[in-house]
A protein has these predicted regions:
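Acyltransferase/transacylase module recognition
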Residues: 103-197
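Alpha/beta catalytic cores of group-transfer enzymes, especially the acyltransferase/condensing modules
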Residues: 1-140
């Protein structure tokens, strides 16, 4: 990924307190301030909850978008400490390398439904799964829609596996009827087991 966007040339920022459509419009406005051949890019990268959208792109364009969005009423525009502008079109070169690797990676049909975060679909075909994994490297994470799709399938509790509890917290902010539980160590495993018993 660092080959695609060298450290220090890309950026991400969380935009808080603003509707995602306003964020998208602000990104377009920011990008329009640069020459079309400048290579400056800023896009919505993560739709985390109804009032939090993460933007990503080239450093100058992200900074300009933050300036525009704060002036337009965003409560906060927080630069994120990341090494690359993930889920943006600048990651396409890295995605192409990922696609090559995925072509030779065995993938079986899931035994439980998995909602992918790029088009909010449940893929069961190995090639569809590969394509979704490829596209998610340079396309936005549609977490708000994923949570709605998971709920529509009858889920009431979402378990976040891995370090931290960001998604569990976002889930609660997206839909208060859902429970989000983090699972990252023996103590949280016990909590999840108790909650699901």
């Amino acid at each position: 990924m660092q080959d695609a966007v060298p450290v220090g040339t890309g950026a991400m920022a969380a935009i808080l307190g603003m509707d995602s459509q306003q964020v998208i419009a602000g990104c377009a406005q920011a990008q329009a301030t640069f020459a079309s051949d400048s290579g400056e890019v800023v896009e919505a990268a993560n739709f985390n909850d109804p009032a939090q959208t993460v933007i990503a792109g080239s450093k100058a364009a992200v900074e300009k978008a933050c300036e525009i969005l704060k002036a337009a009423g965003a409560k906060r525009a927080l630069p994120l400490p990341v090494s690359a502008p993930f889920h943006s079109s600048l990651m396409l070169p890295a995605a192409e390398k990922l696609k090559e690797r995925l072509a030779t990676t065995p993938i079986a049909a899931p035994t439980i439904p998995v909602v992918n975060n790029i088009d909010v679909a449940v893929n069961t075909d190995a090639n569809e799964i590969r394509e979704a994994l490829y596209r998610q490297a340079f396309g936005p994470v549609r977490w708000v829609e994923c949570v709605a799709a998971i709920k529509a399938r009858g889920a009431h509790t979402l378990v976040e596996c891995g370090p931290g509890k960001v998604l569990a917290g976002l889930t609660k902010r997206i839909d208060a009827e859902l429970t989000g539980l983090p699972l990252f160590d023996p103590a949280t495993l016990a909590e999840v087991k108790a909650a699901l018993a």
